[in-house]
Amino acid sequence: MKDRTQELRSAKDSDDEEEVVHVDRDHFMDEFFEQVEEIRGCIEKLSEDVEQVKKQHSAILAAPNPDEKTKQELEDLTADIKKTANKVRSKLKAIEQSIEQEEGLNRSSADLRIRKTQHSTLSRKFVEVMTEYNATQSKYRDRCKDRIQRQLEITGRTTTNEELEDMLESGKLAIFTDDIKMDSQMTKQALNEIETRHNEIIKLETSIRELHDMFVDMAMLVESQGEMIDRIEYNVEHSVDYVERAVSDTKKAVKYQSKARRKKIMIIICCVVLGVVLASSIGGTLGL
């Protein structure tokens, strides 16, 4: 009788290896989802901080000379947003590189598709929050600029929008204020506010520059991911046209048929069209 001990031992070793691989993969995905939750939490914090920034902007604009505490709180929020945004960007980049490595090895699995979907979703949410932050900063800059222009008018100095923009870009506030006579308390207050708003704009533009490269990098990533989403949306939009045309053609055809046959034809056509659309959308999503 043939001794199958070695064969059985080899089969057991093979099963053990498969089990180890399976356990390792499960452990890897557990760690991945922990990363996802951490990134999602950071993005939610960013969103909350952006809302706080809006409130601080309103408080600063409401006071001709805002107190130092309010200005410091805004600076702290700005620093926190920068720190959190860089952290999110770094983690998303790490996931992206991991995905690219597996794709380079021509690996395709359900786990990889899940990671790509999660990465795409988180990237989009991140860019949405940072876009809102960028819009908030731009709006604040415009409001500060308007206040400077109004205060210059109080001092008797009229400027065009282009002149004021040139002054802000050069940082040479003295061009407009050196020859203003300090002949009244109102003029002094106006000049103080001009200086305050100008300093706010300088800080703001520094913050915008610091985040610019990161924002462009992530926006380009999301734009490239959007091609797949756009393709799915295109299929869905056109499916509506197909269904509408199918129903219209069916109505014309069944004028000479019984009601029962009319219903049957409409149901068949709609089912076929919807089946094609669903297959197309699912295929596009899974990269088939």
Swiss-Prot record:
Against InterPro entries, the record matches this protein to: SNARE, Syntaxin, Syntaxin/epimorphin_CS, Syntaxin_N, T_SNARE_dom
As for PTM, the annotation reads: Phosphorylated by CK2.
Q: Which GO terms describe its cellular component?
A: axon; centrosome; cytoplasm; cytosol; endomembrane system; membrane; neuromuscular junction; nuclear lamina
Q: Pfam families given for it?
A: SNARE, Syntaxin
Region listing for Disordered, in residue ranges: 1-20
Ranges in a coiled coil: 29-104
- t-SNARE coiled-coil homology domain location is 191-253
Reported impact of residue 216 to E: In GEFSP9; loss of function mutation
Name the residue ranges with Basic and acidic residues bias: 1-13
**Segments crossing the lipid bilayer:** 265-288
Cross-referenced Gene3D superfamilies, in alphabetical order?
Answer: 1.20.5.110, 1.20.58.70
Instruction: Give this protein's Gene Ontology molecular function annotations.
Output: protein kinase binding; signaling receptor binding; SNAP receptor activity; SNARE binding
What domain of life does the UniProt record list for this protein's source?
A: Eukaryota
Topological domain ranges for the Cytoplasmic compartment: 1-264
Q: Which GO terms describe its biological process?
A: calcium ion-regulated exocytosis of neurotransmitter; exocytosis; intracellular protein transport; negative regulation of macropinocytosis; negative regulation of neuron projection development; negative regulation of synaptic vesicle recycling; positive regulation of excitatory postsynaptic potential; positive regulation of neurotransmitter secretion
List of residues that carry Phosphoserine: 10, 14
Disorder cited: Generalized epilepsy with febrile seizures plus 9: An autosomal dominant neurologic disorder characterized by febrile and/or afebrile seizures manifesting in early childhood. Seizure are variable and include generalized tonic-clonic, atonic, myoclonic, complex partial, and absence types. Most patients have remission of seizures later in childhood with no residual neurologic deficits. Rarely, patients may show mild developmental delay or mild intellectual disabilities.
Q: Which family does it belong to?
A: Belongs to the syntaxin family.
PANTHER family reported in the protein's UniProt record: SYNTAXIN, SYNTAXIN-1B
Q: What protein name applies here?
A: Syntaxin-1B
